[in-house]
């Protein structure tokens, strides 16, 4: 080989594998107002220092790769790289740390939750140096959140559309979730709405199956809600699930719902995907439809305490992508949810400005500026005895959804709906009179049941139901 063609490792640039912390651990970095900030929970492999683990997360979720590459010299890595700027140990846990990472805003496409997650969590979770990794929280700067439309309408516009104020909204998921014909499904919807509910709901896995095709369901449900509206004088809604196998089919279903004149459609935003969800949210805003969001598959992502992603991150992403309602756990029913932590992400869904509060799992102060709020939906194993606690915990700006707690009433769907509406009105009145729902809740329900045989029957059926696993 001639001297002119001889290749040496030292020629051109300094190649090889470097410790991530040399470039990506920067404890002196002062975060910018425009940075996206992330708090991870990292469990390093034995022998990996926390600084190296935190720097590896910053590198692999931004500009880094496993070796030095010559194209690094064609850009300014200092401008674009993520930086691990602080690390703290997790109290009470061995070998767990919270590294904080700052990402420059230019790393992300405007208005794309898909791109944001692809960058921040798309690749780094399989990194060998980490035994486990969890994204606990994100700080979304106004400079980025303003590139999103957010919820199609928001809380106040929804109340104005429905003409319902001063109380939580009441809903019900139609059961059995699978197997009913479209006509019988519509009958169940009608009975629930006539009895006093504001909404009924398709279950998340009701799409367009052989036993009930979507178009038939949409037609019978529209007939049911118009009939219930005429009889009660109240505006009613049914969450028609538009989720489908393709975005084109999803949009076709949403268009048909709009043509029927119904007020609201539904989407499974995690299984359907953020791109599809954002497209549907844009359509809903442009065409006056409310959008109910189900979080099917969330526990696959958020249930493990040391790996995955906390639901507060998914909730923030949903507010950006778009949805007027989203399921948020109950604290009291059959589905898991800790009270303070749940209320933390409920505030992140509803409020404009949320202060940092680690006791509620909020790692960063979040300013949503003018992004509309999302109504949290409490659903899963709840019944009339839970009504005082739910009214106190979630407040007026929420949707309380009783599936089995309505349809399981011994007298039928309509009496089940009556029982829930009477219980809710009693709790709201008691609260407005200054009574303590936490201490007097059972007494308030018993007093109301004296004037409502439907509520009395419900109280008897569910007096000893508890979910203790």
UniProtKB/Swiss-Prot annotation:
Its cofactor is Mg(2+). It comes from Brexia madagascariensis. It is an enzyme of class 4 (lyase). It holds the Pfam family RuBisCO_large. The active site is at residues 175, 294. The modification N-acetylproline is found at residue 3. Its EC number is 4.1.1.39. The modification N6,N6,N6-trimethyllysine is found at residue 14. The keyword Transmembrane does not apply. It is found in: Plastid, Chloroplast. The record marks 334 as: Transition state stabilizer. One of its GO terms (biological process) is photorespiration. Substrate binds at residues 123, 173, 177, 295, 327, 379. It comes from the Eukaryota. The basic functional RuBisCO is composed of a large chain homodimer in a 'head-to-tail' conformation. In form I RuBisCO this homodimer is arranged in a barrel-like tetramer with the small subunits forming a tetrameric 'cap' on each end of the 'barrel'. Heterohexadecamer of 8 large chains and 8 small chains; disulfide-linked. The disulfide link is formed within the large subunit homodimers. Belongs to the RuBisCO large chain family. Type I subfamily. RuBisCO catalyzes two reactions: the carboxylation of D-ribulose 1,5-bisphosphate, the primary event in carbon dioxide fixation, as well as the oxidative fragmentation of the pentose substrate in the photorespiration process. Both reactions occur simultaneously and in competition at the same active site. It catalyses: 2 (2R)-3-phosphoglycerate + 2 H(+) = D-ribulose 1,5-bisphosphate + CO2 + H2O; D-ribulose 1,5-bisphosphate + O2 = 2-phosphoglycolate + (2R)-3-phosphoglycerate + 2 H(+). This is Ribulose bisphosphate carboxylase large chain. Binds 1 Mg(2+) ion per subunit. The gene is rbcL.
């Amino acid at each position: 080989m001639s001297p002119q063609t001889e290749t040496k490792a030292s020629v051109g640039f300094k190649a090889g594998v470097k410790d991530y912390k040399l470039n990506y651990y920067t404890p002196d970095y002062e975060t910018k107002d425009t940075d996206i900030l992330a708090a991870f929970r990292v469990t390093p492999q034995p022998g990996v220092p926390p600084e190296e683990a935190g720097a590896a997360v910053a590198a692999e979720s931004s500009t880094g790769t496993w070796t030095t590459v010559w194209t690094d010299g064609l850009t300014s890595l200092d401008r674009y790289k993520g930086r691990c700027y602080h690390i703290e140990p997790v109290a009470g846990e061995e070998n767990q740390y919270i590294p904080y990472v700052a990402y420059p805003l230019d790393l992300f496409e405007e208005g794309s939750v898909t791109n944001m997650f692809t960058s921040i969590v798309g690749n780094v979770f399989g990194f060998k140096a980490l035994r486990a990794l969890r994204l606990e929280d994100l700080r979304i700067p106004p400079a980025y959140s303003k590139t999103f439309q957010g919820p199609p309408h928001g809380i106040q516009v929804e109340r104005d559309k429905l003409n319902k104020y001063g109380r939580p909204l009441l809903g019900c998921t139609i059961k059995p979730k699978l197997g009913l014909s479209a006509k019988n499904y519509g009958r169940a919807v009608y009975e629930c709405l006539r009895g006093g509910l504001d909404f009924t709901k398709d279950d998340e896995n009701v799409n367009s199956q052989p036993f009930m095709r979507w178009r038939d369901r949409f037609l019978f449900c529209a007939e049911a809600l118009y009939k219930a509206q005429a009889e009660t004088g109240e505006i009613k809604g049914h969450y028609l699930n538009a989720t489908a196998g393709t975005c084109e089919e999803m949009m076709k279903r949403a268009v048909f719902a709009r043509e029927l004149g119904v007020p609201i459609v539904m989407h499974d935003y995690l299984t359907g995907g953020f791109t599809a969800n954002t497209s549907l949210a844009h359509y809903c805003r442009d065409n006056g439809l409310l959008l109910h969001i189900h979080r099917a598959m969330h526990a696959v992502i958020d249930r493990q305490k040391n790996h995955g992603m906390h639901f507060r991150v998914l909730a923030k992403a949903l507010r950006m992508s778009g949805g007027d309602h989203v399921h948020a756990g109950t604290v009291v029913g059959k589905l898991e949810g800790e009270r303070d932590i749940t209320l933390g992400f409920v505030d992140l869904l509803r409020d404009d400005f949320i202060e940092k509060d680690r006791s509620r799992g909020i790692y960063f102060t979040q300013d949503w500026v003018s992004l509309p709020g999302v109504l949290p939906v409490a659903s899963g194993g709840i019944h009339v005895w839970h009504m005082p606690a739910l009214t106190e915990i979630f407040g007026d700006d929420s949707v309380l959804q009783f599936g089995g707690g309505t349809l399981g009433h011994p007298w039928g769907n309509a009496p089940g709906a009556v029982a829930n509406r009477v219980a809710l009105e009693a709790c709201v009145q008691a609260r407005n009179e200054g009574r303590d729902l936490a201490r007097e809740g059972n007494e308030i329900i018993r007093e109301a049941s004296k004037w409502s045989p439907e509520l009395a029957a419900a109280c008897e059926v569910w007096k000893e139901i508890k979910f203790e696993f």
